[in-house]
Amino acid sequence: MPGIIGLITRMPREWAEPQLQRMVEAIRHESFYATGMWIDESLGVYVGWAARKSSFCDGMPLSNERGDAILAFSGEEYPEPGTARRLKERGHAAEAEGPSYLVHLYEEDPAFPASLNGRFHGLLADRTRGTAMLFNDRYGMHRIYYHQTKEAFYFAAEAKAILAVRPELRRVDPRGLGEFVSCGCVLENRTLFEGIQVLPPASAWILRAGAIERKDSYFQPREWEEQAPLEPEAYYQEIREVFSQNLPRYFTGKDRVGVSLTGGLDTRAIMAWYKPSPGSLPCYTFGGTYRECRDVLVARQVARACGQSHRVIHAGGEFLSRFPHYAERAVYLTDACVEVNRSPDLYVNEKAREVAPVRMTGNYGDQILRRLRAFKPGEPVPGLFVPEFLAHVHAARKTYNGLLQTHPLSFAAFRQGPWHYYGLLALEQTQLTLRSPYIDNDLVRTNFRAPESTCENNDLRVRLIGDGSPTLRRIRTDLGFGGRVGYLPGAAFRRFHDFTFKAEYAYDYGMPQWVARVDHLFSPFHLERLFLGRHKFYHFRVWYRDALSEYVREMLLDRRTLSRPYLDRGRVEAVVRGHLTGGQNYTSEIHKLLTLELLHRLFLDGDLPQNTQRTQVKTVQSAP
């Protein structure tokens, strides 16, 4: 994921600058990335960056008029309208568009970066104070890793940048690995790599002379948790006002915006209130090969009702033919924070970038407005892992249960967001800029005042859509919400699509073993065609069994895989052969095993892969 990297050190420049160069090279993954470095030897600051060309944070670093405040910023910030103008009226050289206002905001706002709104991280060097401040957004969504040695403090948007210069860290952390196996992500700001941590949300750490001076935090969730709750009608009016007034901020900037339109409520609400002029906002939906899924069918209706173009981006034969590439790339780009089943997302986002470099989504709408919990610990198939490692897997459940002892919205926004959702966000942002109005500061703060009754169903969003566009209110969602009035027709419609949704899950990776054996007997009839593709666009149970069987066999029955110390060799062989030829369903286990093996091959065994975009990174500015 594009971002900043670097080190703070008192070591000589001849020691530090080559490391910075290697760190920048490690995260330049695409030809459309812009990279650079800035160095101040007197402060011991060595900072670099990678940014998508023409994006909000292209053109770093930022400087004030005197040149004593320098900012390297990554991500996006959605300020109050008129912020740059007001700073210019106070004598600052802030441009009307772009991020230049940020460094001037630091000069005016003693609480900086508390007023910022978005997903971001940055390093601000203050030559007057002789310090550097490393900061991130209040949700911790724009991740930054760090590592401290006696020589330097390292920080990076991707762990691989630190691994590139500190090879002794290329060893797995057993606790983090156990959490990843159990929960699908690492908890409590740990990582898969021993000695590398994640900067906590809302950090504003002060660094001096190559070390951490203070670990400040500019925000605590209790500031929002302790607000007085609102009555249902007052809450709805407040949410409606915040959503409608702040939404236009997310459509600003130089780059073209496309909407990743689904059949659900969250993108529908965006379309209902943004009201784009006809033909100005390209829309697209991700689809599969069996049939047009409900997302495609409904999204097409929504786009047509709004006067916008719509296209389907398919993940099918081309993707499957290059699955090894996309699987390995997905794991590598995210520092193994996603499993290989997210590789289709890399493929479709490459295609989405051709439509528009900014992708508007409804991400996090359910999690914020309804406080939904999207992940929980799982139990591995018996015997797959050796008992010594299984203890770490079981410990993850205890850790997770402890983390639930907080406000449910705080869990969703400040824990689930930066841990569970980070991997997919990081993967997608390697290709384009993702935006969502559902983690807007004002909206999340207001949602902490929601009465519990409004979080129990979809009524609030259906009403919000209707107030913005009665036409869009009349189109049923992919699962049958909204649309025509009348209990029986609506209830029957919802029951039918709820059944097809669950049936697709049961026929894909959720298929019970006894059903898998029956399905195996009838495999010549391809019964999957009856169920798959109605709601999802990827189908790994069948793919692993058929199109990807050779890759699965070569990877997981390889002697290197079978020799991993935490795996039971015989059980791994039984899982692979059972899924490929024995009429059993081990889709989730194969996801995990492939991901763990790629973790070893890409990060732990031998040298890190060479970046195909490797070029000499220029130092755009340097201070003696």
PLM features: residue spans?
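Glycine- and acidic
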Residues: 224-233, 257, 283-287, 329-334, ...
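Glycine-rich phosphate-binding loop signature in dinucleotide/nucleotide-binding domains
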Residues: 252-254, 352-356
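Cysteine-centered catalytic environments shared across enzyme families
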Residues: 1-318, 325-326, 594, 600-602
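Catalytic metal-binding/acid-base residues of hydrolase active sites
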Residues: 266, 364-365
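ATP-dependent adenylate-handling ligase core
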Residues: 288-348, 366-384, 400-402, 431-432, ...
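Conserved structured core elements
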Residues: 233, 237, 241, 268, ...
